[in-house]
């Protein structure tokens, strides 16, 4: 049992040179780059609070769980232990599961599910089973992650097909762009390590951490906005960016502008 907590007990080893900057930290840059989770998560919790207060305070669980993703990511890259790997991957699964249960469109629920509470219980049950199964067969977590992610992407594509709001479409394209950049860094670090070692630039996985947090901020706000437009249209949800709404780069969030019943085309 102690072996799963041992340094470098994981089969995964990223491109960054081990113990290059510290004798106690296996992957220093990958560990330090995980700090971005602790910067962005509290800001998003604050920015999305008006929406969460009106819609469901459970929305905060997404970004609270992202803090745990950051903690476990730091632990994993600091030790490259098998337990660190499992905690890192499972925390990501729980972020997806929480978002899935909160924001999956009601109109796409299976016929045997009558309300969101029942849907959330179903998702919770599947996630718990996947979590427990992962400690027996680690690939179970990968299957669950892919199932949630693919279904979320498909549902989002269906929702955006009928959307004509330019600000929403801009946010969608920004989310896709950040996600593509993040995945490209992950794949390149994982499978193109020899090339980056020749250039003495083995930090793409750390850059992935930064990009995926930003992609999550953009994508979760997009999904939350579509949800607000359907579930609480009377609140007149609108998109803005922090710290300045007219800046080219910022963190997107939802503002609620009114109480009259109305709805945009999204």
From Swiss-Prot:
Keywords: Calcium, Endoplasmic reticulum, Hydrolase, Lipid metabolism, Membrane, Metal-binding, Sphingolipid metabolism, Transmembrane, Transmembrane helix, Zinc
Gene Ontology terms: biological process: ceramide catabolic process; sphingosine biosynthetic process
Lumenal face of the membrane: 1-27, 78-83, 137-139, 189-205
Molecular function in Gene Ontology: metal ion binding; N-acylsphingosine amidohydrolase activity
Stretches of the chain found on the membrane's Cytoplasmic side: 49-56, 105-116, 161-167, 227-266
Transmembrane annotation, as ranges: 28-48, 57-77, 84-104, 117-136, 140-160, 168-188, 206-226
Residues binding Zn(2+), per UniProt: 77, 205, 209
Reaction catalysis annotation: an N-acylsphing-4-enine + H2O = sphing-4-enine + a fatty acid; N-tetracosanoyl-sphing-4-enine + H2O = tetracosanoate + sphing-4-enine; an N-acylsphinganine + H2O = sphinganine + a fatty acid; N-(9Z-octadecenoyl)-sphing-4-enine + H2O = sphing-4-enine + (9Z)-octadecenoate
Summary of the function given for this chain in its UniProt record: Endoplasmic reticulum ceramidase that catalyzes the hydrolysis of ceramides into sphingosine and free fatty acids at alkaline pH. Ceramides, sphingosine, and its phosphorylated form sphingosine-1-phosphate are bioactive lipids that mediate cellular signaling pathways regulating several biological processes including cell proliferation, apoptosis and differentiation. May also hydrolyze dihydroceramides to produce dihydrosphingosine.
Family affiliation: Belongs to the alkaline ceramidase family.
Protein name, entry field: Alkaline ceramidase 1
Record organism: Danio rerio (Zebrafish)
Gene this chain is encoded by: acer1
